[in-house]
Amino acid sequence: MNGTSRPGDPLLHATRLEKRFGTILALDDVSLSVPHGQCYALVGESGSGKTTLLRTFNAMVRPDSGQVTVAGRPVGESDPVALRRSVGYVQQEGGLLPHWTIERNVALVPRLNRRTDSLERARAALDLVGLAPADFGPRWPRELSGGQRQRAALARALADAPDVLLLDEPFGALDAITRVEVQRIFAALRERLALTALLVTHDMREAFELADAVAVMKDGRVEQVGPAESLLEEPATEYVRELMHKAGVA
């Protein structure tokens, strides 16, 4: 995605976003910037606006006011193909199409993006996440474990070599051992590929372990943004303090 950002500028930038769903104010004057190569986590209770904010960066949600940019280009003005090439998306429990093989699932994004080598890209992405294409490519999603399905979903998001990865509670449905395994794969790939990432999670420990900075949300607003140390040592509001305590990290 050829935007107008310069070195040092945030790759993801939201300015004074507001979004209503009927009478519910889901985003209330929200601003957030994520620098190149950083992983930020969005945390907060259910209904705090985390997923709504995440989805403004790939145009799944259109804010009523404010501006969202990726690499300096307003998302609302971006060509859909260019946006999909730049921004990968992993949803909770993967979202694999059950009647498609794993290889076809992973090839979906490059195919939508008009790539002529979509199968080659899919196989390379499966390799990236540790799923041998010859073995896992012909299988159906139901034949894979939960961890393998989520790795395939991660491969699909990476298949067109995006600059940005958006992840909506990607590890929440996994058992404890599998969760750690997939988290390690994500962390290694993020470093290897120099990805910028925005992660939604309910797990404060997960946020602290995987993210460079954490944004705490409540009632559609961002209460505080910063590295784990600043949230623990200098919580900006009583809500942030209580959230740290409830999560057992304070």
Regions found by a protein language model. Give the residues of each.
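Conserved ABC ATPase signature
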Residues: W140-L144, Q148
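ABC-type ATPase nucleotide-binding domains, specifically the catalytic core motifs of the NBD
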Residues: S78-P80, W100, R104-S118, D127-G130
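Conserved catalytic motifs of ABC-family nucleotide-binding domains
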Residues: A161
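Helix-to-loop junction immediately C-terminal to a conserved catalytic motif
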Residues: N58
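The feature captures the beta-strand-to-loop junction immediately N-terminal to the Walker
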Residues: V43-E45
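Conserved ABC ATPase "signature" C-loop
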Residues: D219-G220
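ABC ATPase "signature
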Residues: V225-G226, E234
